[in-house]
Amino acid sequence: MENKLRESKALGSTKIRFLVYTLLLVCAAIFALGCEEVQKTGTGGLGAAKAVDINDLTMQAYKIILDSLGDKDPAIRTNAIEVVAQTGQIKLIPKVQRLFADEFAPVRFAAALAIGDLEYSFGAGTVKELFKDEDSNVKLAACYAMVKLGSAKYLEVLRRAIGSSDQTVRANVAFLLGKCGDKEALKLLYWAMQDKDSADKVIYQAAESIAMLGDDRIYPKLWTMLLSVYADVRVCGIRSMGALGTREARNALLSMLDDKVVEVRLAAAEQLGRLRDTTGEPEVLDVFTSKLTAGLDERGRERVNVMTAMAIGRLATPSLIKHLPKLIEDESKAVRIAAARAVLESRMKN
């Protein structure tokens, strides 16, 4: 089916397969977490909402993230760590550091990234302890954190690791090189993208990382991803166009607002919001006004609501923010975390 997401060679993203719908919906990177399957729209949904003051939701959002850091589900813990980093919740970093001892490697991976993303210098000592971790991906995340904390020598470790035969390691390294802003790694990323032995997850992550580094030569590759018959590949291309951020990339994103799959439209709206363009607002509102989650199964509804919340966080318009109170009280933990992130992001913009 056109809207069925392809699972390519254990395709992954910044939240392992067991994460189900991680908040980033990254088609690339972390722990080979993949883009989940996309379903077509239904009818029925969340209904009308009144205008709200985003400040009224802030404490509720903070508590959701705080509680989620201690959740029994490792996917939820990972999602919460990501939100801490994405929204700059520096007060929660000590709790994130405790998760360096988590039994699940993806949680430790995300915790190391958070230290680097927030450039939390007080965490350097504990990050170095992760070099003893049994998981190679966690060690690489520790290298990323140290680079962000000023130890550029660890870049060389990451550059060498992209040649790994382990496709998950290779994809994660591509992701980390992009996050490091290492333009000297462009040649390596092109190699990884073009190598015949690279899995799809490596190819798509390398493409996104090249876009993150601002190399507009990647545009034709990203455009072909937008033309894919597979919705998950289109979503990956959309994320990469958002990372590239050129005028041509923005125009490409605008064209994806007409996609027949709701998740693809939401991804395009979110990435336009990333570029401070609110053109996609009607596509997000349509989830509520046309009740697009009605008729979906539980997982499909959760997925659409997570992506809706993510788009709201990027766009942060009053007409969208008013729907956050319902999303933040959704029965799904993943939706509540996504809504909490949207609240915190919206507050930063308003």
What are these regions (language model features)?
Residues 36-53:
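Bacterial Sec signal peptide processing site at the extreme N-terminus
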Residues 72-73, 103-104, 134-135, 165-166, ...:
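Short inter-helical turns and helix N-cap capping residues of alpha-solenoid HEAT/ARM repeat scaffolds
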Residues 165-240:
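Solenoidal tandem-repeat scaffolds enriched in leucines and small polar residues
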